[in-house]
Amino acid sequence: MDNNLKALFGSWDSAIGTILSAIASTPASRFNETMQTNLDLLGNVMQATGSALAADSEKNITLNKLGNQLQAIGNSTVVSGILIQFNEETKAELTIKGNLLQSVGSGMSLPDLLDTNEISMNTLYNIYGALLQSIGNALQGLSGIIQLKGKQGQNINFVGSWIQAIGALIQALVQSKK
């Protein structure tokens, strides 16, 4: 597969996955708990696949490539927490760690994006997208920590999920313009 096509497909796969996961985290959703879990699982699998494809589309080792790999690892960590029959605390910890790995992965692309003499509008949108994804994932991780302490963190998770989805969508749109 051509690297540009791989990056484009990976970008949209990841964006659609984040939207599915955000829908799953929406409190007023009409889906039952099983459907929400399945949507979140599918969303995280799509995000992991998309990030892996985006990383594979880059020939050279860059912070952006490493960041995409780290995001794929983070999503895979969340997936393992959903699929493997651990106790609830272990599942929550895997989700927290997976979200925080994704946050760091999104942030790792920023130095590459900022390392230019002339910043275009596409570069600015990519920066915004990466920042939004990093912030959204960090909020999701924070919500998990809050919930582990027995407090209500669902609203923070909801907001973080949609912030991440907006960032991924922006980056997919930029990739489409290339």
List where the protein language model places each region:
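Glycine-rich, hydrophobic membrane-spanning regions of integral membrane proteins that mediate transport
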Residues: M1-L131, A138-W162, L169-K178
